[in-house]
């Protein structure tokens, strides 16, 4: 895997919970590599996560912007969080990077962005873990209350 020889089309960052994904889109053969491993191997063949990662590319194929002739390699470096949080961070990063790709015509770029917005791929899920409060066992879990 030599990323320096391939043309970098776009870069973006996606975040979810504690996971941070740095995404690079390169002109290539359509490979999806996460932390120097194939996406299938990295996500333990979890079909739901794999479908979520490929969904932004499917939107582009439905709009007939991305064809087999101009395939895109996706190189991802992801840290922190669990597998599902990482998968959602990667999905957001891929969608952001695909919005940055130069396509012929400004209407096409607006169309890509609008379709991603409608599908919810550019929406950030801002929910994070609630902090633990003193006097409690967890964020909201308290010891059992005794009246007498």
UniProtKB/Swiss-Prot annotation:
GO cellular component, one term: small ribosomal subunit
Primary residence: plastid
Superkingdom of the source species: Eukaryota
GO MF annotation, one: structural constituent of ribosome
Location in the cell: Plastid, Chloroplast
Keywords of this entry: Chloroplast, Plastid, Ribonucleoprotein, Ribosomal protein
Disulfide bond positions: none
GO terms classed as biological process: translation
PROSITE patterns: RIBOSOMAL_S9
HAMAP family named among the record's database cross-references: Ribosomal_uS9_B (MF_00532_B)
Similarity section: Belongs to the universal ribosomal protein uS9 family.
Name under which the protein is recorded: Small ribosomal subunit protein uS9c
Organism: Tetradesmus obliquus (Green alga)
Gene name, Swiss-Prot/TrEMBL: rps9
């Amino acid at each position: 895997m030599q990323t320096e020889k391939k043309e970098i089309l776009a870069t973006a960052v996606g975040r979810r919970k504690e996971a941070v994904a740095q995404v690079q889109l390169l002109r290539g053969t359509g490979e999806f590599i996460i932390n120097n491993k194939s996406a299938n191997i990295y996500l333990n063949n979890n079909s739901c996560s794999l479908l979520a990662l490929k969904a932004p590319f499917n939107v582009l194929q439905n709009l007939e912007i991305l064809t087999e002739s101009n395939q895109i390699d996706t190189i991802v470096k992801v840290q922190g969080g669990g597998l599902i949080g990482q998968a959602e961070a990667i999905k957001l990063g891929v969608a952001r990077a695909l919005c940055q790709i130069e396509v012929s015509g400004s209407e096409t770029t607006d169309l890509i962005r609008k379709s991603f917005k409608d599908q919810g791929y550019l929406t950030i899920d801002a929910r994070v873990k609630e902090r633990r409060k003193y006097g409690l066992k967890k964020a909201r879990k308290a010891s059992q209350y005794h009246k007498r």
